[in-house]
């Protein structure tokens, strides 16, 4: 459930009229709901009851420090993939001891900084990385806590660009090689093995791929026991899907119950999850103004002031996201539109063949935009990044101001 609802045919974010936000802050505009973020995080956290667990919000999904601060206040951990994300977490008041560091290309500087602030663990993705971390930790006089990211070769049945658990993907160590890598890790003087990690993909709408991956990890854990290697945690990553249109992904409680049943023989093993989209997607919308309506022999176009520079998911993943009118009290003729943006690319669209009742100057909202929206935005076509607003009840807070045009070239120089 989210807190974007119609009241008297006008769209509200919690107790704030979205039209008022658009008029106050301008468009394009990302709007987030605090109550929705908190509800979704608690859905994961409460699902595990008294079982040792840690919910690590995936920073990549929605990296604004205003959002991260809400997560930190809830006691959330964080899944990061860069030093930039680490610094965001720290700036937002996050606890470094609840940070897990994923990613296939961790640099020397990133590893040093993570060791300096004492993150919870590195999710190691290759033998080379493991040796690199061991060397750097030794130079710093530290012991690096590590979890090996195991690639279980499980088909997540999702878009190929967000499938991460097949043997042809770049992520992690093959499940068939992981035992030997753990043995190697156990011999390195500056490494402490703390757990096992796995992430098979994103926007999964069924439980079976998760359970198949868990089965393979359990087999590996038993093998490690034979080798005298014990684990303190099992990190099953993120990936639980959300409802964009008519998808019916499992509820976090169903997911948790299935995992707890699988892991009932490991009561002391802490479970770590890394949800991102499942927390933030339906906690945000992207508000735009209809600049022009245009028709040709085959199509009607609603041309808006936002596009793939602000929301690239439709272009990159062929993602379907609902588009709705902000004010349904207005008398408008219904028509089928391709909703497009101002960017000079044919792939610049928010949605195709959508029935809308709109006129030029009206506001519309792209739903489920809280994940992989602002965090994947760009300045393509020299367009300034949009503002972001957080709604808390009947109050709104500007958590990112709109970029100025001068800031587009502030880091550049002529010769």
Swiss-Prot record:
Sorted UniProt keywords: Amino-acid biosynthesis, Decarboxylase, Lyase, Lysine biosynthesis, Pyridoxal phosphate
InterPro entries with a match to the protein in the record: Ala_racemase/Decarboxylase_C (IPR009006), DAP_deCOOHase_LysA (IPR002986), De-COase2_C (IPR022643), De-COase2_CS (IPR022657), De-COase2_N (IPR022644), De-COase2_pyr-phos_BS (IPR022653), Orn/DAP/Arg_de-COase (IPR000183), PLP-binding_barrel (IPR029066)
Residues that coordinate or bind substrate: 277, 313, 317, 345, 372
Active site (catalytic residues): 344
Record carries keyword Protein biosynthesis: no
Annotated GO MF terms: diaminopimelate decarboxylase activity; pyridoxal phosphate binding
CDD domains to which the protein is assigned, alphabetical: PLPDE_III_DapDC (cd06828)
Domain of life of the source: Bacteria
PANTHER family cross-referenced by the UniProt entry: DIAMINOPIMELATE DECARBOXYLASE, GROUP IV DECARBOXYLASE
SUBUNIT field: Homodimer.
Family, as annotated: Belongs to the Orn/Lys/Arg decarboxylase class-II family. LysA subfamily.
Record's protein name: Diaminopimelate decarboxylase
Gene expressing this chain: lysA
């Amino acid at each position: 459930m989210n807190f974007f609802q119609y009241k008297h045919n006008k769209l509200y974010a919690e107790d704030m009229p979205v039209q008022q936000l658009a008029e106050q802050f301008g468009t394009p505009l990302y709007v987030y709901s605090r109550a929705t973020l908190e509800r979704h995080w608690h859905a994961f956290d409460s699902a595990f009851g008294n079982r040792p667990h840690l919910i690590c919000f995936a920073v990549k999904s929605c990296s604004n420090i205003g959002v991260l601060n809400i997560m930190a206040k809830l006691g959330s951990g964080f899944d990061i993939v860069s030093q930039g994300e680490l610094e965001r977490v720290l700036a937002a008041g996050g606890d470094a001891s609840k940070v897990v560091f994923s990613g296939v290309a961790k640099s020397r500087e990133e590893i040093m900084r993570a060791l300096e602030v004492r993150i919870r663990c590195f999710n190691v993705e290759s033998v080379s990385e493991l040796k690199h971390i061991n060397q750097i930790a030794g130079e710093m006089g530290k012991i690096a806590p590590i979890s090996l990211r195991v690639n279980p070769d499980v088909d997540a049945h999702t878009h190929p660009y967000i499938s991460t658990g097949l043997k042809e993907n770049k992520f992690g160590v093959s499940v068939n090689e992981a035992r030997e890598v753990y043995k190697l890790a156990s011999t390195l003087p500056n490494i402490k093995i703390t757990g096992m990690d796995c992430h098979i993909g994103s926007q999964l709408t069924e439980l079976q791929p998760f359970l198949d991956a868990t089965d393979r990890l359990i087999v590996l854990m038993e093998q490690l026991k034979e080798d005298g290697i014990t684990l303190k945690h099992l990190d099953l990553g993120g990936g639980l899907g959300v409802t964009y249109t008519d998808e019916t992904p499992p509820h976090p409680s169903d997911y948790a119950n299935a995992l707890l049943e699988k892991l009932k023989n490991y009561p002391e093993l802490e479970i770590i999850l890394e949800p991102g989209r499942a927390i933030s997607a339906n906690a945000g919308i992207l508000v735009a103004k209809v600049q022009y309506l245009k028709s040709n022999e085959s199509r009607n176009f609603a041309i808006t002031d936002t596009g793939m520079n602000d929301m690239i998911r439709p272009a990159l993943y062929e993602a379907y996201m609902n588009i709705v009118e902000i004010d349904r009290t207005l008398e408008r003729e219904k028509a089928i539109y391709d909703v497009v943006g101002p960017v000079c690319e044919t792939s610049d669209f928010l949605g195709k063949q959508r029935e809308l009742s709109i006129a030029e100057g009206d506001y519309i909202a792209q739903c489920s935009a809280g994940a992989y929206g602002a965090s994947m935005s760009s300045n393509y076509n020299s367009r300034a990044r949009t503002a972001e607003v957080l709604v808390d009840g009947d109050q709104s807070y500007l958590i990112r101001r709109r970029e100025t045009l001068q800031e587009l070239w502030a880091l550049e120089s002529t010769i």
